[in-house]
Structures are given as structure tokens and as C-alpha cells.
Amino acid sequence: GVDKEGCRYLLGACTIDDDCCLHLGCNKKYGHCGWDGTF
């Protein structure tokens, strides 16, 4: 994920990892942001 204005939080809709905020990645199966395992 990225640290930028407008990034999606946990369970926010996404198509790619960079749609999501830091420490979140896009879950392609469900189409939302989830924790990517980083701190």
C-alpha cells in the first residue's frame, strides 16, 4: 500500500495494491484492501 491522500483503508474497494493505504494490499479475490503482513 501507499501513504497518500485518498488511499483506501481496511476493507476499502481496490483493484491494485497501491489503491490501499500503508500496510494494506489489495485482496484480488474480494476486491478490497487487507493487511499485507507488514508493520
UniProtKB/Swiss-Prot annotation:
Swiss-Prot/TrEMBL keywords: Amidation, Disulfide bond, Ion channel impairing toxin, Knottin, Neurotoxin, Secreted, Toxin, Voltage-gated sodium channel impairing toxin
Expression by tissue: Expressed by the venom gland.
Entry keyword Secreted: yes
Disulfide bonds: C7-C21, C14-C26, C20-C33
Any GO MF annotation of the entry: ion channel inhibitor activity
Modified residues (Phenylalanine amide): F39
InterPro entries in alphabetical order: Huwentoxin-1 (IPR011696)
GO cellular component entries: extracellular region
Residue runs in coiled coils: none
Miscellaneous comment text of the record: Negative results: the recombinant toxin has no effect on american cockroach Nav channels and on the human voltage-gated sodium channel Nav1.5/SCN5A.
Main function: Insecticidal toxin that acts, at least partially, by inhibiting insect voltage-gated sodium (NaV) channels of several insect species. The toxin binds to the voltage sensor in NaV channel domain II and inhibits channel opening by shifting the threshold for channel activation to more positive voltages. The toxin binding is sensitive to residues in the S1-S2 loop of the domain II voltage sensor. In vivo, the recombinant toxin causes paralysis and/or death to two dipteran species (Lucilia cuprina and Drosophila melanogaster).
Domain remarks in the Swiss-Prot or TrEMBL record: The presence of a 'disulfide through disulfide knot' structurally defines this protein as a knottin.
Name of the molecule in the record: Mu-theraphotoxin-Ae1a
Annotated organism of origin: Augacephalus ezendami (Mozambique baboon spider)
High-level lineage: Eukaryota, Metazoa, Ecdysozoa, Arthropoda, Chelicerata
